[in-house]
Each structure stands twice: as C-alpha cells, then as structure tokens.
Amino acid sequence: MDPSVTVIIPTYNWSSVLPYSIGSVLRQTFTDFEVLVVGDGCTDDSEAVVRRIGDPRIKWINLPINTGHQSEPNNEGLRQARGQFIAYLGHDDLWLPHHLSCLISALKQGADLAYGTILFLLAGPNGYHRWFWPTYERYQPGMSIAPTSVVHRRSVTDQVGGWRHYRELDTHPDTDLWRRAYTANYRFVFVPRLTAIKFPAAARHDVYKIRPCHEQAAWSERIQNEDGFEPAELIRTVLPMVAEYEAKPYKTLLHDFMQRTRKGLMQRIRHLISPPARPKGDSIEARREFKGLPRMP
C-alpha cells in the first residue's frame, strides 16, 4: 500500500545535518509517510549517513550532476513520489512532532496547500534573533513561504508543473510555485501552529565550507526533551516585547509583534534579494556565494 505522504528532503554535501532533519521526520506523530532524500549530485558520505539510519521508509536518490538548487532534487522527488500529499524539509531544518498531523488535517478538511508557522533562527553575536513566519493568515501572491513549512496535494504540482530552474525566474522557485498554484485557484490554508524550525543557510556566511551541525543537534535535543517546547518558544520571542509594550492594549502589542517580525527578517535578508534589473537567477547565485558555494557554470 502506498504511503499517504511523501517527504522530500533535497540535500547537497552536508551529511552531518541529515540525522537531525530525518530524525525529526521519524518522530512525527503522523507516521504514514515515505522519505525521499534526494542528493543534488552529492559527492560526500551523505548516502552512507542516510543508509545507516536504517528505516525502510527512507529512500536515497542522487542526481548524476549538481544543479545548484533544490528545484531539480524536488522535481525528482515529485517524479518518484507515491504519496497523495507532498511535504518538503530542508536538509538543515527541523520539524516539530506535530508538523505533519496539523497540516495533513488541514488538507483532509479541503485545503490543497497548507502551511504552518516556522521559527527562523538567525545567529548573532549575542545569541539568536528569533522571528516567526508567516505572521498573518491570508496568502498573497508573491508572499514568501519556506518549503519546510508546506504540505500540498500531489495533484497541485501534477496540474501546474513542478519547480522551475532559478535561472528562468525573476523570483525564487518556491515563491514562483506557490504563486502558480494560487493563480490556478488552489485553496491555501494557514495553520496557526509553530510546526518547524529553520536555520537559514543564506544568513550563515560560509556555512557550506564549515558544514556544522551543532545548532541542529542542540535544538533537536530541546524539541525531544522540553515539555511544552512550542508555547515556550512563543513566550521567549514575545516576552521582550511585553516588557516594552506592557502598557499597550493586546491588539496593539500583537500588531507590533507581527510588524517587527516581518520587518526584522526582511532587513536581514534584503541584501540577498536581487533587484528587478539584475539577471535572472542572480540572487540565488549571490546566496550560493554567501553560503560558501561556487557560482554555477
């Protein structure tokens, strides 16, 4: 019998993080899934690391050449998917245990694409800067939604097509895919739960030269061992604002929090987003260089 969900994990030469991302899938309360770990022409020990996990639901696939972005690994995952629902997980990201159950529930209630709130962790000299994204319910065309936070019906990509190559686009491939799905009148539903954690490589200089996993290890341990991890993280992020705005009405506080979350995140990644006049795909190439990867030929 085919699984309900196909989880696609695109990866490239960063094997140390895979036990943590894959482990967060294996700890899901919803267990009817397969996991396709798709290497983008990996040349390191990623295959051996995946096989050592030893779960029959996990399949290793490696593309013959490096394509430079998650689009083609995701497309290969879509081609080999057996599930009626598709979930994506960045190889250096983590899911909370209720991620699939929350989003699959929304799909079973009629959504075509569901997404939860993701905690972005940007490392700074004095610790983490935390942002939740998205901070509002309604999808708007062009809105950024991290693939790690998305589950959609396989019929969506069957109809609108898969992931486009970044050099064909003036925007990012994930933003392009969500916009095409929305334009085709598929129903988007926001699930107001914190369901995933993202460690954006585009905000970590030379991370692909260092290939660390200490952040994923520490946060994975917290997720597993801290009771009430989700509300605790919400409180940790909101409390500094409470001290500053304790005299303000709740609605004002919430509005300010949403605005700060969006503004703060965008300020830190704006230098990685290409202006319209730049060549197609140039922002992805800039991200690659910042992360410690060479520009693609």
Predicted regions and their residues:
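Conserved nucleotide-sugar donor-binding catalytic segment
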Residues: 136-220
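N-proximal low-complexity "stem/linker" segments adjacent to membrane-targeting elements
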Residues: 1-24
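Short, acidic, metal-binding catalytic loop of nucleotide-sugar glycosyltransferases
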Residues: 23-32
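Short aromatic/hydrophobic "clamp" motif used to bind/position activated sugar donors
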Residues: 86
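Short, flexible, basic/aromatic active-site loop/helix in glycosyltransferases
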Residues: 117, 124-147
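Glycine-rich, basic loop-to-helix element that forms the pyrophosphate-binding segment
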Residues: 63-81
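Conserved donor NDP-sugar-binding/catalytic core segment of glycosyltransferases
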Residues: 94, 98-128
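A conserved acidic beta->alpha catalytic loop
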Residues: 39-48, 65-67, 90, 96
